Amino acid sequence: MRVTPRMWIGFVVFVGYCATIVLITKLVGVPYPEIGKSAEATFKGAVLPIGVGALLLVITATALGWWRPALFERRRSPRRWPIVAPVIMVVVALVNLVSTDWSQFDAAFLLSLVGLGVFVGFSEEMMSRGLVLTAFRSRLREGWAWLLSSLLFGLMHLLNVALGAPFSSTIAQVAIAFGSGTAFYVLRRVTGSLIAAMVLHGLWDVSVFAVGFAPKGTVFATLVAPVIAALSLAVVYWVIKGTNENPISHASTSAHAAA
């Protein structure tokens, strides 16, 4: 690592990422409620700003030298069964995709949705459960690092109000995001890598936007989101228990071993 992880760096990454997304979205002038309703609105209102955010995160991770701790656990959770929460999330996402009337999408719209999934999956995970979690682990015990990084991930969705989203529905979105963020954290701990969480996050968002735009009928699967959130919160203790992923202590141990 070029730069020793510090907690304040996590807050700087969080604020910088959020500010970038809001600024670019405001500049392109696409209200949040329009995202997911057309190829142009989805590209300008989501793919473009989040893509720029992804580029900045790549630059930041490279400058800090944090790619390894951001993407990989030193030791994954010995308890595998909590993966049931993200597995249910995968099933719900697939049901959403099957429940979507894909005839309503042209090629440009499909490409925009794919771009949305790729950039959201990478950017939001790299920011919250990558760089921010790495920074928080340098100072906090694992339980607090999970809690604070997940809270910030949930609160980040309040920015949608500034972009035109209704406040009442956004509050619910914040709560669900905290729970789904916990599911992504559980997946990281169980698999030992952030990559699976990136893939699931992208798949989830694409499925929600797709079925929201062109449902074949009543969408029941998305209603399971609060259950997934609650289940994730119920099992997260078991992937936190006994965990020490402090990047500073591990770096010091490696240095002493090499000497």
Name each model-derived stretch.
Residues 32-46, 58-126, 133-134, 138:
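Juxtamembrane helix-loop-helix connectors linking adjacent transmembrane helices
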Residues 97-107, 162-168, 213-220:
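Membrane-interface helix caps and helix-loop-helix hairpins in membrane proteins
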Residues 13, 146-153, 196-206:
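Central hydrophobic cores of alpha-helical transmembrane segments
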Residues 123-148, 189-193:
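Membrane-interface helix/loop boundary segments of multi-pass membrane proteins
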Residues 6-62, 83, 87, 111-112, ...:
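Alpha-helical transmembrane segments in multi-pass membrane proteins
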Residues 22, 170-226:
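Functionally important transmembrane alpha-helices
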Residues 89, 117, 121, 142-158:
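Small-polar-interrupted transmembrane alpha-helices in polytopic inner-membrane proteins
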Residues 70, 202-259:
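C-terminal membrane module of polytopic membrane proteins
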